[in-house]
């Protein structure tokens, strides 16, 4: 939901917030998917740093989203700071997506259910992205980008709580 909406709304965000023309804004936001790709590439190293504990890695990625989202709530930031924060959120969510859409379904390979689990998770991911796009469209229209970034932080806080509960349960 978060990553797809960054892709969808950020060109318009830079045009609206910083009066950057559309062509320059499109070039400006090209940085976001590049950093997101680097997040995916960094997954093996980050997973090793978290001692192959996927929930711990996801929790840390969501914490990065919280920090970057809170910075975005300030209206006094430059476009460079905004692009860095959005890129970090995008990269962190790319790591989370790798955990949940690629690694997690592998746990079901022994039962022969990997494809089913992967398909179900993909379905809900795309459905969430579609519903999120619609909701964020209304949210931005009515409340501005502040509400969108606040929701990124809130969703990330909820996700950290869930991940940390999973870690505690797994270690008990």
Question: What is each of the regions a protein language model found here?
Answer:
Residues 1-40, 97:
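Extracytoplasmic gate region of multi-pass secondary transporters
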Residues 12, 98-108:
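Intracellular helix-loop hinge segments at the cytoplasmic ends of transmembrane helices
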Residues 39-52, 140:
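Helix-to-loop junctions at the C-terminal end of transmembrane segments
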Residues 41-45, 134, 161:
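Residue-level hotspots within transmembrane alpha-helices of multi-pass secondary transporters
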Residues 53-100:
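C-terminal transmembrane helical hairpin of 12-TM major facilitator-type secondary transporters
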Residues 108-142:
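A late C-terminal transmembrane helix in Major Facilitator Superfamily
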Residues 136-156:
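A membrane-interface helix-boundary motif in multi-pass transporters
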């Amino acid at each position: 939901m978060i990553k797809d909406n960054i892709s969808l709304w950020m060109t318009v965000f830079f045009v609206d917030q910083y009066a950057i023309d559309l062509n320059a804004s499109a070039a400006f936001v090209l940085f976001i998917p590049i950093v997101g790709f680097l997040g995916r590439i960094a997954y093996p190293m980050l997973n090793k740093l978290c001692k192959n504990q996927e929930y711990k890695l996801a929790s840390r990625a969501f914490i990065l989203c919280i920090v970057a989202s809170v910075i975005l709530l300030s209206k006094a930031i430059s476009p460079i700071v905004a692009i860095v924060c959005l890129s970090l959120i995008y990269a962190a969510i790319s790591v989370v997506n790798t955990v949940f859409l690629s690694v997690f379904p592998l746990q079901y390979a022994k039962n022969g259910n990997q494809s089913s689990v992967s398909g179900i998770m993909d379905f809900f991911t795309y459905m969430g992205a579609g519903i999120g796009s619609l909701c964020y469209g209304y949210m931005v229209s009515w409340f501005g980008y502040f509400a969108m970034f606040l929701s990124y932080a809130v969703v990330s806080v909820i996700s950290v709580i869930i991940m940390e509960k999973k870690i505690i349960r797994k270690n008990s």
